[in-house]
Amino acid sequence: MKIFQRKMRYWLLPPFLAIVYFCTIVQGQVAPPTRLRYNVISHDSIQISWKAPRGKFGGYKLLVTPTSGGKTNQLNLQNTATKAIIQGLMPDQNYTVQIIAYNKDKESKPAQGQFRIKDLEKRKDPKPRVKVVDRGNGSRPSSPEEVKFVCQTPAIADIVILVDGSWSIGRFNFRLVRHFLENLVTAFDVGSEKTRIGLAQYSGDPRIEWHLNAFSTKDEVIEAVRNLPYKGGNTLTGLALNYIFENSFKPEAGSRTGVSKIGILITDGKSQDDIIPPSRNLRESGVELFAIGVKNADVNELQEIASEPDSTHVYNVAEFDLMHTVVESLTRTLCSRVEEQDREIKASAHAITGPPTELITSEVTARSFMVNWTHAPGNVEKYRVVYYPTRGGKPDEVVVDGTVSSTVLKNLMSLTEYQIAVFAIYAHTASEGLRGTETTLALPMASDLLLYDVTENSMRVKWDAVPGASGYLILYAPLTEGLAGDEKEMKIGETHTDIELSGLLPNTEYTVTVYAMFGEEASDPVTGQETTLALSPPRNLRISNVGSNSARLTWDPTSRQINGYRIVYNNADGTEINEVEVDPITTFPLKGLTPLTEYTIAIFSIYDEGQSEPLTGVFTTEEVPAQQYLEIDEVTTDSFRVTWHPLSADEGLHKLMWIPVYGGKTEEVVLKEEQDSHVIEGLEPGTEYEVSLLAVLDDGSESEVVTAVGTTLDSFWTEPATTIVPTTSVTSVFQTGIRNLVVGDETTSSLRVKWDISDSDVQQFRVTYMTAQGDPEEEVIGTVMVPGSQNNLLLKPLLPDTEYKVTVTPIYTDGEGVSVSAPGKTLPSSGPQNLRVSEEWYNRLRITWDPPSSPVKGYRIVYKPVSVPGPTLETFVGADINTILITNLLSGMDYNVKIFASQASGFSDALTGMVKTLFLGVTNLQAKHVEMTSLCAHWQVHRHATAYRVVIESLQDRQKQESTVGGGTTRHCFYGLQPDSEYKISVYTKLQEIEGPSVSIMEKTQSLPTRPPTFPPTIPPAKEVCKAAKADLVFMVDGSWSIGDENFNKIISFLYSTVGALNKIGTDGTQVAMVQFTDDPRTEFKLNAYKTKETLLDAIKHISYKGGNTKTGKAIKYVRDTLFTAESGTRRGIPKVIVVITDGRSQDDVNKISREMQLDGYSIFAIGVADADYSELVSIGSKPSARHVFFVDDFDAFKKIEDELITFVCETASATCPVVHKDGIDLAGFKMMEMFGLVEKDFSSVEGVSMEPGTFNVFPCYQLHKDALVSQPTRYLHPEGLPSDYTISFLFRILPDTPQEPFALWEILNKNSDPLVGVILDNGGKTLTYFNYDQSGDFQTVTFEGPEIRKIFYGSFHKLHIVVSETLVKVVIDCKQVGEKAMNASANITSDGVEVLGKMVRSRGPGGNSAPFQLQMFDIVCSTSWANTDKCCELPGLRDDESCPDLPHSCSCSETNEVALGPAGPPGGPGLRGPKGQQGEPGPKGPDGPRGEIGLPGPQGPPGPQGPSGLSIQGMPGMPGEKGEKGDTGLPGPQGIPGGVGSPGRDGSPGQRGLPGKDGSSGPPGPPGPIGIPGTPGVPGITGSMGPQGALGPPGVPGAKGERGERGDLQSQAMVRSVARQVCEQLIQSHMARYTAILNQIPSHSSSIRTVQGPPGEPGRPGSPGAPGEQGPPGTPGFPGNAGVPGTPGERGLTGIKGEKGNPGVGTQGPRGPPGPAGPSGESRPGSPGPPGSPGPRGPPGHLGVPGPQGPSGQPGYCDPSSCSAYGVRAPHPDQPEFTPVQDELEAMELWGPGV
């Protein structure tokens, strides 16, 4: 027998050997040990002890040899050892033991002996004595044979032992736990009618190893203890305590009434979940709890768990090999407590107990409800009411007196379902709970929100008060794009319900949201929207004092403080633009204007926020007026004086001209502006002269000419003559009383006559008026006499738009004076003016006009399209409106618009104009690629188009084809047309719901060739094998340069024949798509492009050759991402087939994408031609290659493979079950997880589903929360139904909150929601049912039950196979068949319904309720043999690493202790293809090639980018004039007034922002621990608050830079792998250093290698955050960064606690809250110990070591430390023992395997 084996230069412990601990120190000379004794520990273990020799010696040699022969195994021990345990012995084998003391090179005589375990057992007393023998130091482990105390009380008990089986214990220490349990069980009288003992083991998820009623004898229990398997996982003690509370102390599990109930917990670490509520539940239900902690257990936590007093119920030992020291004390205490409880139970046996009944909830509010119950029987001391949110949270409780039967639960969360349990508390026991649920109401919200008193920068908000609210939160933000983030909030007290929001932006729409606050909780919001007022422009513009070169502007000010005004005015032709800014005044003169010019005015108010919209107006300056007074006096025979009055200071000069009336020379003189008279001399006597006067202004313009006639005196005349002529010539008289006669103030029915009185002797004036047309003799219309002192008269009523001649005659006492006449004209009936158009869009526009000067009653607007027939439309608006938005117009259409003013006398003349909507249509529409049966329409896109409707119509038979394409499309092709036919192609542009007019062209298809008549090709008939084909088939054709035109046509012919073999094309059959690939793939047509074989084949014939390089990998990815999509027509549940044709090696990688697609269920056929790489084809094609890979020598050899390819493709497409890739092989079946969207890339879109860690923490699973009701239409999943034989496979687990009622794990419903087939789980009855309909239409079910079925309901992951055949149904659980039952052959299903997961059986209809559970795998395999081949590799307890594939990101830990390098390995194979190299330097220019042939014309290039916008500014539109003759090209139009900056428009109103929520109180976070199998989640924990960053640990020595690794995974996985790698490396190195120290007899001080905490499991995808809870304890420190190679030994760090990240909580997203309080400082992680040094005081740390050489790059791995348990320690060989060290109180060495 071999105990040690030398390898290289180190002594290493063999796998079956443990470490010997040392106990005593004896000094003296070398002498032999004495008193060699043996003590049996178990059936394969023995303890050897001896007395140390006297004198000085260095150590011992322990030799163990099988007597029957075999290798002697030797172990060197230190001189302090006096005992050792040998394990792994054969009970029937005789062994010789020798113990030799030595000192340097001298040895003592051996102390030796022989033993056989069976012989030693026979000598033992079969009944151990009750008396306990004190062993002094107590370090000796007790064995069942050594137990001296046996509980002999007649009292019995139900004892449930809960054992921690987490990774931190390790397999080695778990053996010591078994020894402890064996000793514990031995102390009691165990039997079915005596004390019963059950046991559960827990880690991530608890499991029952055996129930209380599982065994009937003590021997059976002890045998079960010895065979107890080690579980492994995380430490979730709270979950485990709750598990035994719900499962172990139940009658069905063997628990008895009237019997003491004892719970014993054994754990080695701090729990990663909350232990207080489950411990309290157990204690209050009558279970007395004992807690035994080992090593890193938390004493405070043990005290929280155990019953009182702590001194007798809490035990804690430092190491596992010291557990035997507490056996006696524990068993004594248990025995005495059983006796005491038995007496108490018997004393109260006559008392009546029971739970309360009739749980009723009432008075439900948002924060409370009342709970009522009927009293429990007997003498109830108190009632305990426990309540907690169903979706997770910390339980609360209320304790009331036993006389009370109701209580109000307060401070609840609103709109939350609560679980309620009421327990009756008796003197010595507690009843079962009376349970129920209730949901609180939603918090009352504010109502009647009113936004009012809106100004430019403020508004008031008002709402009705909410009873009970503690305050209100108001959020408000602008909706304008670009300002949405400028959100503000306001918190106010509960007494305020009317507030003002100030500081707002003008002319901006705001959304205002009000929340009622109840403490930190908020109600639902009430929201309103309102727009602030625009900045007020000035009002009521008035233009006065308009002259020829000036005018005055007057306006009313705005209602608020402004900074000033900006005035802009310009003339009509845009040559004169002026701008001036003025102070806050209300009038301003304009000067320096041009006479007779139209000016446009715009006045802006200027505020701090900007400027307002303009107040506009238009006016025209007057012409330079004629002189209204011209007088001739001082007349002589040769001269007279001309006198006038200047009209303005701007008159520059006067030009005076005169000429004899009867002919003669005109003379003139230019006079200065200050002159107002001039004497004309040198005239002829008695001659009549015409005198003219005009003013010449500074700008060169001239006034109208004023004329007067004067006659010089004859030589005999002496009295002067005077003539006054206003604008017309008047005969000179010598007496007149009138001058400056003016007719003005025109209206439509009146004129005012004014004159100056020049003679005070006038008694009266006679005013006569008549129309100016007609005969001069016509009759006077009217005569009015006025006094001589009156100088004006209003003439009315007159006719509108009529010219009148008014004559005023002065009347003297002696007769009439000279009459003076003047014309006047009434105004026409006034109508609107200045029609303007704005806001033009594709279906609307706005018209604006200026009101007429005369009063109106309203306006009538009439409009009609110009070029298309249609009704005339009209509308009416009030007198105060001068603008209207006309809607529902046609796009790009001219409309005639007429506006009539409604006046008292009727309608005015119409203001007419032509307006036009914007054109919603394409441009540059052309027909291209015109063939005999096809053509393509090309156009230039419209910038606002969202879609195009393209229509082609035959002008012969009026047949139409129509398609709708996207707004970015520039072409569309039509096929199946008639040759030599005229077609009209129309494109309609669509903008959302608006459709523009068609843009059309005519095109004629090509004629049939007239040379040899040809006939349309015969459509190939479908082949028999393809009659049932139904698939989505994509052909990928290599279009690279190496193929060429001729060979490409051969490929097209091959495709034509292959597709022709198909039967039905379209959604009811096979859909075909085509991609041509080179550098960039190009879609020739999509899967849903063609519905008939004829059109499909025609499209194939017209595929053109592309040319380029070969990028096959890129093309395959393109096909997956672009063509296998819903938009392209991909159907769910239909086989996906790809056929790749290529003639060369790809210039990119094809392996990865091909593998991914094969794993996703795609069937890929690869066809290689000529120079194609066969190995690459094998990588591309699916397996087996014999069916999926083809190769031909040239392009003429396609016929050789055509039939075989068609057969294989059609067989793949005809299968009811598509091909899926599972566990490395291709199978026919359905990947149901993918079909339900339960995969990593899709699950976030499935409502009610979250991703959680699954088995091994490396597989994802998906938690279906309550009422998630995940479903999919059957036609997507199983369009052809189910096969006759199939296997349904699930990997799932039941959760604590999974209801007790039956639910369908999976079922198919028809369109009436009737179940057709499915699997039912009854969590309450612990049964499994499968049902379907048989072929005769009868409903049939089979139900399975029993112990093997029940275990799937206990919270662990289990694998379930249901094998359905034509005669029976088999159930296989965890790869073990547990039952089968006969069943008739099933009928096929209909595909008109849905398939659902988790639907409650009692829930009817398409909706309803569903149960929560976790699902990791769900497949349907179309075979009955799959269950026999499955190895359950996903289950930790059944996984065989040798036959199972590697776990994702896994690594293996070496089982040898060798540290020396092995021999060089054989040369490696060829490496992977390297990455693409950098671009090389350009090579030298090659010789010129021959001139190529002229190529075909290239396609038309895309339209160029739109040019920049012009800088001109639109002017005010003028009045429409009469249509004139076509003129020459005019000059650029005038500029308009620059408008104010408009506020940006907005898109749609965004949804309201959710309320920032309160800071959620944190639940207790679990500390990081080793990765393990996740357990059944309990009530989800609540996120803890973040603590401050812990102090950094000391840095390690940096390692050498490694090679570039492969792309990493998510950050959390990378961190886990990095930390795990450190754990393994550090522990191996320290392990080896410790071995070296021991075997070379180097004394060493105690140097514990402490447990390194394992990394946390990979975080799941975030679920919806749970409801906020209370503040939890501080979180544990996170992992430090990656370490380098080990540095010098560090100080021993504090022992960390183990744990892992908890699963995400379940629930809807809570509102945002403020930051939580800071947590306590974290701890640094202990450093890795270095190798031990020689004895002596601790020296200073050494310098950093030189970094080692760069190691080779490895594949990315994931090292689970738990799998590296105890390096170098394997299970014992049947023929070899293993040693278990015994630790004394002296020198101790701790050795822990990685991950322990």
From Swiss-Prot:
Secretion signal, residue range per the UniProt entry: 1-28
Motif, Cell attachment site: chain positions: 1607-1609
GO biological process terms held by the UniProt record: cell-cell adhesion; collagen fibril organization; extracellular matrix organization; homeostasis of number of cells within a tissue; regulation of cell growth involved in cardiac muscle cell development; ventricular cardiac muscle tissue development
UniProt xrefs under Pfam families: Collagen, fn3, VWA
Low complexity composition-biased segments: 1473-1482, 1573-1585, 1741-1757
Basic and acidic residues bias: start-end ranges: 124-134
Disordered: region residues: 124-145, 1462-1613, 1644-1781
4-hydroxyproline, modified sites: 1467, 1470, 1482, 1497, 1503, 1517, 1520, 1532, 1538, 1544, 1550, 1556, 1565, 1568, 1574, 1577, 1580, 1595, 1598, 1643, 1656, 1659, 1662, 1665, 1668, 1674, 1677, 1680, 1686, 1689, 1704, 1715, 1726, 1729, 1732, 1735, 1741, 1747, 1756
Region (Nonhelical region (NC4)): 1217-1458
Keyword Signal listed: yes
UniProt cross-references to InterPro entries, sorted A to Z: Collagen (IPR008160), ConA-like_dom_sf (IPR013320), ECM_Assembly_Org (IPR050525), FN3_dom (IPR003961), FN3_sf (IPR036116), Ig-like_fold (IPR013783), TSPN-like_N (IPR048287), VWF_A (IPR002035)
Functional description taken from the UniProt entry: Plays an adhesive role by integrating collagen bundles. It is probably associated with the surface of interstitial collagen fibrils via COL1. The COL2 domain may then serve as a rigid arm which sticks out from the fibril and protrudes the large N-terminal globular domain into the extracellular space, where it might interact with other matrix molecules or cell surface receptors.
Stated name of the protein: Collagen alpha-1(XIV) chain
Organism: Homo sapiens (Human)
